[in-house]
Amino acid sequence: MEKPYNKNEGNLENEGKPEDEVEPDDEGKSDEEEKPDAEGKTECEGKRKAEGEPGDEGQLEDKGSQEKQGKSEGEGKPQGEGKPASQAKPEGQPRAAEKRPAGDYVPRKAKRKTDRGTDDSPKDSQEDLQERHLSSEEMMRECGDVSRAQEELRKKQKMGGFHWMQRDVQDPFAPRGQRGVRGVRGGGRGQRGLHDIPYL
């Protein structure tokens, strides 16, 4: 009992944890885990300042979540694994971008696009309203023209659709015989008398 207690007594990272969760392998990892944590913060803050986004509240939340992540990584590892966090993850990527709750994540490009749209939209909408502002008479004329054009189109389509039926329309009561059954173009009119013959 005395050995694990003495080993972890001076370890800053394990102060708030119960003794059950403390692992003796964590002693060598604590310094290496803190380095990428600090680097990730500075990279993330530098990017935000360069972009000029007001993100003070978001920075505070990110820092808190990063510290929690650093502690939880040490807890979840089995005793057999001795890899430090800096070897497992490349240092080129900022730590904040690796693990973040899905609800908090908003892509930066999408933010920029929506911001641009809201800045320009009031001016554009006023111009559009002025252009669209027509008198009621003009509106009625336009609507009338459109409806007339649609009616004409319908009539043309109906008339065009019946061109192939004109032969049958001319003599609707003519005897049909086997025309519909054969499927021959022209209805098989040349063989009208064949259906009267009982045997061929």
Swiss-Prot record:
Residue numbers carrying Phosphoserine: S30, S65
Principal subcellular localisation of the protein: nucleus
Alphabetic keyword roster: Nucleus, Phosphoprotein, Transcription, Transcription regulation
Region entry Disordered, spans: 1-200
Compositionally biased intervals (Basic and acidic residues): 37-52, 60-80, 115-154
Start-end of Acidic residues biased regions: 20-36
Record-level GO cellular component terms: nucleus
Localisation: Nucleus
UniProt superkingdom: Eukaryota
InterPro entries reported in the protein's UniProt record: TF_A-like/BEX
Functional note: May be involved in transcriptional regulation.
Family membership noted in the UniProt record: Belongs to the TFS-II family. TFA subfamily.
Protein name, UniProt field: Transcription elongation factor A protein-like 6
Originating organism: Homo sapiens
